[in-house]
Amino acid sequence: ALPVVKDFTAQVKERAVGTDVLKSLNPGQVFLKIVHEELQSVMGEANEKLNLATQPPAIVMMAGLQGAGKTTTVGKLAKYLAEREKKKVMVVSADVYRPAAIKQLETLANEVGAGFHPSTADEKPIDIAKGAIDAARRGAYDVLLVDTAGRLTVDEQMMGEIKDLHAAITPIETLFVVDAMTGQDAANTAKAFNDALPLTGVVLTKSDGDARGG
């Protein structure tokens, strides 16, 4: 995170020093305008939609630590794609370490009207995902959302499993789900996942929580 902050402050300083101030504005207003514009540049100046331009089903894989909100995000994303984008969506849980995650996703799928591919803790994540892909093709689904297992911390076994799963199903989008209250460790966690997977986007959850969290 430090390189990003350094680049940001350098850009603000470069633009702010020596900038002419219009008569209708004061220096503070001009500075805030520059900061706002640079923040937009860092965070992204436009909303980017999910890339679903592939032969159906477009596979979207979720990755992140346990408790970040991956399963809930899958439900919300399924609802968004169905209602806003008019897509036929199927969801599947490849989390064989937390059986409750499978039931949770089934409940969410029923609530939002998405297709649900059943799985059990006895199966292998790759077999689950491949079975879901076949089912999604047979059912003419546009999108398949794949929920994955998380851990309390980043470890080699977790990264190895998720790398193998990614290689097996080749998702068009791989989204990193992170808790907004993770704090400074979020950058390290994101780097670890990005080193293991070609992440295409980030989902920030619980951003309406305690502002002191992170």
For the regions a protein language model found, what residue spans apply to each?
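Conserved catalytic-core segment of NTP-binding enzymes
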Residues: 124-138, 151-214
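Primarily NTPase-proximal linker/entry elements flanking Walker-type ATP/GTP-binding cores
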Residues: 1-94, 101-122, 129-146
